[in-house]
UniProtKB/Swiss-Prot annotation:
Native organism taxonomy: Bacteria, Pseudomonadati, Pseudomonadota, Betaproteobacteria, Rhodocyclales
GO CC aspect terms: cytosol
CDD domains in the record: IHF_A
Name the record gives this protein: Integration host factor subunit alpha 1
Transmembrane residue ranges: none
Subunit structure: Heterodimer of an alpha and a beta chain.
Listed SUPFAM superfamilies: IHF-like DNA-binding proteins
Source organism superkingdom: Bacteria
Length: 105
């Protein structure tokens, strides 16, 4: 299932009573703040959900799968997410989660 910014705004509108414009502004402001924090290299902790952080990955050797030629993979920064214990427990105990669904993913 994919959840879009529009879906989140609609949920805010329905559950909290924001009008559509306010809900969209809140969602946009939230994601802008997340992006800005990550660009500055700051860690983002969302209690009960998890932690977003930046990690530096060094250059490493790679391989072209078609030719087998070795090529360097450049150093880069990547966003990582670590789920909180609460989120992990909720997912693991979810009755909607089946082993078939996990294997299919």
């Amino acid at each position: 299932m994919t959840i879009t910014k529009a879906d989140l705004a609609e949920h805010l509108s329905n559950e909290i009573g924001f009008n559509n414009r306010e809900a969209k502004e809140v969602v946009e402001a939230f994601f802008k703040e997340l992006s800005d924090c990550l660009e500055r290299g700051e860690e983002i902790k969302l209690a009960g959900f998890g932690v977003f952080s930046m990690r530096n990955k060094p250059e490493r050797p790679g391989r072209n799968p078609k030719t087998g030629e070795e090529i360097p993979i450049t150093a880069r920064r990547v966003v990582t997410f670590h789920a909180s214990g609460c989120l992990k427990s909720a997912v693991e105990s979810s009755p909607n989660l089946s082993l078939k669904a996990v294997k299919a993913a």
